[in-house]
From Swiss-Prot:
This is NAD-dependent deacetylase sir2A. It comes from the Eukaryota. It comes from Dictyostelium discoideum. The gene is sir2A. Residues 231-503 form the Deacetylase sirtuin-type domain. Its cofactor is Zn(2+). Residues 130-175 have a biased composition (Low complexity). SMART domains: ZnF_UBP.
Length: 512
């Protein structure tokens, strides 16, 4: 999953409507078994017809399904990637962003179903009394959910109905006949809602918990919400962001970072002609360049990955301005969390506390045998790599497995800490800073969707993340909270430090 930039194939452009059918998610997908062998370990869903099949690493029924149907695009339930069988590569496109959220929701829902004990009937009836109220209409799904609350011994029942363009809400108080009628309608609406519950809404509930996180409100409530939001920033500029950070209102800052913050440290990127890391791998005749980050390919041929690792291994690079800025935020008690895609451990070297750090794609800091899971030191792996030897498992008798740094590959799940912190942190976020990332790798990229009602700042070489599914609203007339700073992220962060008046403290951190 790390550093993969899937292509936009023709099937996601000219043939999107033919190949992608979102209605496949309307059916019950709580159990994602292969349709042919019932295996549950690693399955893909056909984005055209919704058939669930196992991967080539199990029994290969997904490939057989393609041969029989010629449906090109499938999505992974494991890592939420998309594969085009016709183009024979990983693919992605902006309209697939919301499908990533749906896949994450299904995965989270299945995991939760396995670990949560079954409640008795009385508990379920009690919970039914506090289900959040919401109505959502999308291009393919209409959802109605009822809400019943009791305030000062007075029961208020609200029922919501939706069409494709409007949402109306009616409320009846202290009228028994109307309450009974409304409750009857609510029961019917709730029943229908349970059958066709919007998967995106379920995604939010899984990440944030019921009754928490971004709220879905009626238009009148939305107007009030926007008025409240407009008080945070007078206008969406970096100068206003600096004032906001220095105010008492900003207490919990989340920073999302990508490879762009480490380029200034001398770490080469992947795709630059002649100098990019991928150029050095051409001689290994990879099936596709990103195969070096495929766990099954690694098990068969780990050498290309270790050639690449020599260019990235920690110890040869120093933190950058951005890393030390995040450290300063932590020292000032403003950093809630730093979610990073980087595997270079420069955040650790800069002194960002471990409890403030989420290495979403893992790192070189620890390593394990892919066969027996025995942990090995970074020094052991580094010594073998720089001797051009494969780091084999030596401490488990007869194992001889390959020792791999704990970097997340395709086919591997993100660290549990990623989901745990995302669920907890984004309900508290006062400010989101997104620095040096292309926002193309999911589910990391979709995190920006969950920073609701607070300022969001993009500091990047180019504008990214402006998708219609919760992305930045830089160029929209309604934008009051999203700020973009386009250019070199090191220079732009230095400018922000000056606006904040933190130059002396920053210089002291760098000096130390």
């Amino acid at each position: 999953m790390y550093a993969v930039n899937p292509i936009e194939c023709i099937h996601l452009k000219d043939e999107y409507d033919t190949c992608i059918n979102k209605s496949i998610f309307d059916k019950d997908l709580k159990i994602t078994k292969c349709h042919a062998c019932n295996d549950e370990s690693e399955n893909w869903i056909c984005m055209t017809c919704g058939v669930v099949s196992c991967s080539r690493h199990v029994n290969g029924h997904a490939g057989e399904h393609f041969e029989n149907t010629k449906h090109p695009i499938s999505a992974s339930f494991s890592d939420h990637s998309f594969w085009c069988y016709t183009c024979d590569t990983y693919v992605h496109n902006t309209p697939l962003f919301d499908i990533c959220e749906i896949l994450e929701n299904i995965k989270s829902s299945n995991k939760k179903d396995k670990i949560v004990p079954k409640k008795d009937q009385k508990e379920e009836e009690e919970e039914d009394q506090v289900v959040p109220s919401a109505s959502i209409t999308t291009s393919s799904t209409t959802t109605s959910i009822s809400k019943q609350t009791t305030v000062n011994n007075t029961t208020t029942t609200s029922s919501s109905s939706t069409t494709t363009t409007t949402t109306t809400t009616s409320t009846t108080i202290n009228n028994n006949e109307e309450e009974e009628e409304s409750e009857s309608e609510t029961d019917e609406s709730s029943s229908e809602g349970e059958e066709s519950l919007s998967l995106i809404q379920r995604m939010r509930e899984m990440i944030f918990g019921v009754g928490r996180g971004p709220k879905i409100v009626a238009p009148s409530e939305q107007e009030e919400s926007e008025e409240d939001e407009s008080c945070v920033l007078k206008k969406p500029t970096i100068e206003e962001i600096a004032k906001y950070i220095n105010s008492a209102k900003c207490k919990n800052i989340i920073v999302m970072t990508g490879a762009g913050i480490s380029v200034a440290a001398g770490i080469p990127d992947f795709r630059s002609p002649k100098t990019g890391l991928y150029e050095k791998l051409d001689k290994y005749d990879l099936p596709y360049r990103e195969a070096i980050f495929d766990i099954e390919y690694f098990k068969k041929n780990p050498k290309p990955f270790y050639v690449l690792s020599k260019e990235l291994f920690p110890g040869s690079f120093n933190p950058t301005t951005v890393h030390y800025f995040i450290k300063l935020l932590s020292d000032k008690g403003l950093l809630l969390r730093n979610f990073t895609q980087n595997i270079d451990t420069l955040e650790r070297i800069a002194g960002i506390p471990a409890n403030k750090l989420v290495e979403a794609h893992g790192s070189f800091a620890t390593s394990h045998c892919v066969s027996c899971k025995k942990e090995y030191s970074t020094e052991y792996v580094k010594e073998r790599i720089f001797k051009d030897e494969l780091p084999e498992c030596t401490e488990t008798s007869g194992c001889k497995g390959i020792v791999k740094p704990d970097i997340v590959f395709f086919g591997e799940s993100l660290p549990s800490r990623f989901n745990d912190c995302a669920r907890e942190d984004f309900t508290k976020c006062d400010l989101l800073l997104v620095i040096g990332t292309s926002l193309k790798v999911h589910p990391f990229a979709s995190l920006i969707n969950f920073a609701k009602g607070c300022p969001r700042v993009l500091i990047n070489f180019e504008e990214v993340g402006t998708n219609p599914y919760g992305g930045f609203k830089f160029n929209q007339p309604s934008n009051k909270l999203d700020v973009k700073c386009i250019g070199d992220c090191q220079t732009l962060v230095l400018d922000l430090i000056k606006l904040l008046g933190w130059e002396n403290e920053f210089n002291q951190i760098v000096k130390n």
